Amino acid sequence: MSVEQSLLGKETQYPTSYQPDVLFPIARAQSREKYAHIQGITQGKDWWHVFEISWLNAHGIPQVAIGRITLPASSPNLIESKSLKLYFNSLNFTQFDSTQSFIETVEKDLSAAAGAKVELTLFQVDDLETSKPQGICIDDLMPERLEQHPDATLLKLDESGEEIEVELYSHLLRSNCPVTSQPDWGTVFIRFKGKKPCYRSLLAYIISYRQHNGFHEQCVEQIFADIWQNLQPEKLMVYATYTRRGGLDINPCRVSDLTWMPKPIRLARQ
């Protein structure tokens, strides 16, 4: 199904009964065609935090929780966010014999839409704590030039030629939803092993996404691919934590080496 057929940007009725067929899969293949040769594009996970989860227990009493969805980057499909919101709303008045039964139902439905095994972890509403970013923040640097759209030629190696392993982050990631043009805000983490990158050039490159139209997952994969091709690291991780919209936040992570897979976190802006 094409993105244009999705419910994004359209007025919709919120379902009041269980409706798994509202889930809208979007194939990853088309946006990955030009990156097919790059190691790590399909390695990683998409973590979603779902803050508006509710269902009825066996006695008809509402239950609430915060959920973390784990979707493998190797899945053939991602799931469009508004359809996921509508799906969880459809469970608000549905009775389940147990919390485990609720989890199993959600995992079954999301796995069918994604085309791969999806996991759901539930947290009590007070249990999902925020973390502080680790690494070097590059936001106070001064880029040599700025561009309005993603430009991989901005990426440069440091003149020192030094070999390093470093984790950098920036809170200045901004892109637009490709359907509604609404802004998406995020913090991006880049863990890098190889010849030292020019940090100012990395910041300029991140800033160049500010008017780019792309889903969260696609932006992270483009950042990963451009750094991999232009800076040629030995190992690379790109992980973005996007702010919440409609009760959901999306956090894609791509790694060239599975030993570099981080644990999912939640930042203050989420």
Swiss-Prot record:
It comes from Acinetobacter baumannii (strain SDF). This is NADPH-dependent 7-cyano-7-deazaguanine reductase. Its EC number is 1.7.1.13. It catalyses: 7-aminomethyl-7-carbaguanine + 2 NADP(+) = 7-cyano-7-deazaguanine + 2 NADPH + 3 H(+). The active site is at residues 177, 184. GO terms for molecular function: preQ1 synthase activity. GO terms for cellular component: cytoplasm. It comes from the Bacteria. Coiled coil: none annotated. Belongs to the GTP cyclohydrolase I family. QueF type 2 subfamily. Catalyzes the NADPH-dependent reduction of 7-cyano-7-deazaguanine (preQ0) to 7-aminomethyl-7-deazaguanine (preQ1). It is found in: Cytoplasm. Keywords: Cytoplasm, NADP, Oxidoreductase, Queuosine biosynthesis. SUPFAM superfamilies: Tetrahydrobiopterin biosynthesis enzymes-like. NADPH binds at residues 81-82, 245-246. PANTHER family: NADPH-DEPENDENT 7-CYANO-7-DEAZAGUANINE REDUCTASE (PTHR34354:SF1). GO terms for biological process: queuosine biosynthetic process; tRNA modification. Its main location: cytoplasm. Pathway: tRNA modification; tRNA-queuosine biosynthesis.
